[in-house]
Each structure stands twice: as structure tokens, then as C-alpha cells.
């Protein structure tokens, strides 16, 4: 435990919070270009073919970003919007692609949680 004189001399050091999405440079989202679109398998207890894209951001960083939802239209050279948010069972994937923004289409046939997937309101739901 420090003495009062030691605290007067140096003071307490503040614990700084480390960012979990470093490549975004403190921005909420970043634009980028897909350099590779591929599928990969998750960690041990889970089994699937997860859709992932390698994206070069406008600040020069290159990141792996997850493509959420069922089906997508992304290919190489597609312009996408990238937000933070990791995928727990995919190591190295710490970003998500925003559906319904720029070149990324929304999820077709989505009726619930539509705003998360860029889906328009279906016609038959209106009364």
C-alpha cells in the first residue's frame, strides 16, 4: 500500500479500456472492399459452413468479417459496410458485415428481426 507522499508524487494510474475492434479506428462502421469470400468451419462443439469475407477497409486494414443471415450476393470487389462484433465460434473473425447497406443485399424472406438483416417489410403483413 503506497504512502500519501508516494501518491502525491505519482498518483494512481488509470486502467485504460482496450478496444475489441481496433481496425475500425474508433468509428462505428467502416467501408471496405471484399478481397476474398469463402466458407469456414466453427470451433469444436459446433458444425456448419460459416460464410466469411476478407475485407480491405478504407483505412488500409484488412480484416475477416462474418456475413450474417441466410444466403448472400457478395463476391470479390463488392463494396461492403463493416461493423464491430465478433463471432464466438470462429477464431479471428471480430467484425460483421452490415446487411442491406452498399453492395450487400438484405436477407430475402425475413419476417422477424428484419432491421438486423436489411429486409423490407413484407406486403402481406400490412393491414
Swiss-Prot record:
Record field: compositional bias (Basic residues): 111-127
Gene3D superfamilies: Nucleic acid-binding proteins
Keyword Ribonucleoprotein listed: yes
A GO molecular-function annotation: rRNA binding
Pfam families the UniProt entry points to: Ribosom_S12_S23 (PF00164)
GO biological process assignments: translation
Region (Disordered): 101-127
PTM-bearing positions, type 3-methylthioaspartic acid: 89
Sorted UniProt keywords: Methylation, Ribonucleoprotein, Ribosomal protein, RNA-binding, rRNA-binding, tRNA-binding
GO annotations of cellular component type: small ribosomal subunit
Subunit structure: Part of the 30S ribosomal subunit. Contacts proteins S8 and S17. May interact with IF1 in the 30S initiation complex.
Protein's job: With S4 and S5 plays an important role in translational accuracy. Interacts with and stabilizes bases of the 16S rRNA that are involved in tRNA selection in the A site and with the mRNA backbone. Located at the interface of the 30S and 50S subunits, it traverses the body of the 30S subunit contacting proteins on the other side and probably holding the rRNA structure together. The combined cluster of proteins S8, S12 and S17 appears to hold together the shoulder and platform of the 30S subunit.
Family recorded in the similarity comment: Belongs to the universal ribosomal protein uS12 family.
Protein name, per record: Small ribosomal subunit protein uS12
Protein's organism: Flavobacterium johnsoniae (strain ATCC 17061 / DSM 2064 / JCM 8514 / BCRC 14874 / CCUG 350202 / NBRC 14942 / NCIMB 11054 / UW101) (Cytophaga johnsonae)
Amino acid at each position: 500500500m503506497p504512502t500519501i507522499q508516494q501518491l502525491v508524487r505519482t498518483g494512481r494510474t488509470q486502467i485504460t479500456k482496450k478496444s475489441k475492434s481496433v481496425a475500425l479506428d474508433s468509428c462505428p462502421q467502416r467501408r471496405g472492399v471484399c478481397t476474398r469470400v469463402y466458407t469456414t468451419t466453427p470451433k469444436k462443439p459446433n458444425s456448419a459452413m460459416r460464410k466469411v469475407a476478407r475485407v480491405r477497409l478504407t483505412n488500409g486494414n484488412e480484416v475477416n468479417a462474418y456475413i450474417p443471415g441466410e444466403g448472400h450476393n457478395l463476391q470479390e470487389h463488392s463494396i461492403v459496410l463493416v461493423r464491430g462484433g465478433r463471432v464466438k465460434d470462429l477464431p479471428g473473425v471480430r467484425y460483421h458485415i452490415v446487411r442491406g447497406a452498399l453492395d450487400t443485399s438484405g436477407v430475402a424472406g425475413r419476417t422477424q428481426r428484419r432491421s438486423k438483416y436489411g429486409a423490407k417489410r413484407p406486403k402481406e403483413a400490412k393491414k
